[in-house]
Amino acid sequence: MKRTTASSSYCVHAGMLIENIKIWLVVKPLQFFYGRKRLDDKLDAMRNLPENSIGYDLAIMLDLHNLRLIPGFRNHDLNHLVLGYGMEWDDELCMQAYQVGNGYREWQCFVFLSSAIIVPTLWPMLWAHFQMGRASVSINELDFETCMMEQTVVVRERFRQCKTNSLKAGLAYAG
């Protein structure tokens, strides 16, 4: 039992480290340096879009996490909303694995995903999400600007469809 507790404690500490790296080395500097006013105005406009639209739901999601829009990361936040991944460190790692499997080749994915090396207990789950990404419709065509007025459920359904049954195989592997 002690081993499980030690493993859980390690995982919690590793998760806190990963979360702090994400917040203090990526999110906060980008929020500070990029045009706050213009993007804050955009976020305000999104809050006034129809309920259940991508734009409205994305604004609410960012508000709940005390985040703002960041240039270059708008599609990233959109992926959280559409794919249903949370914003905690383990969900973030799973989404990065999914995106790499789905053909996303942005440097941020690889940098953040590389932090998983300190949490080997997550590797089977990350592999499963990588496999789900490979089996799913490409999210590379999902665009922040063009889908703001679309209903969130419709967009989620469109991008969560799998090309094959390998999604079930990936989930079975994750246990």
Named regions from a protein language model:
Residues 144-175:
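Elongated scaffolding segments in large macromolecular assemblies
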Residues 31-156:
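Core of folded catalytic or high-affinity ligand/protein-binding domains
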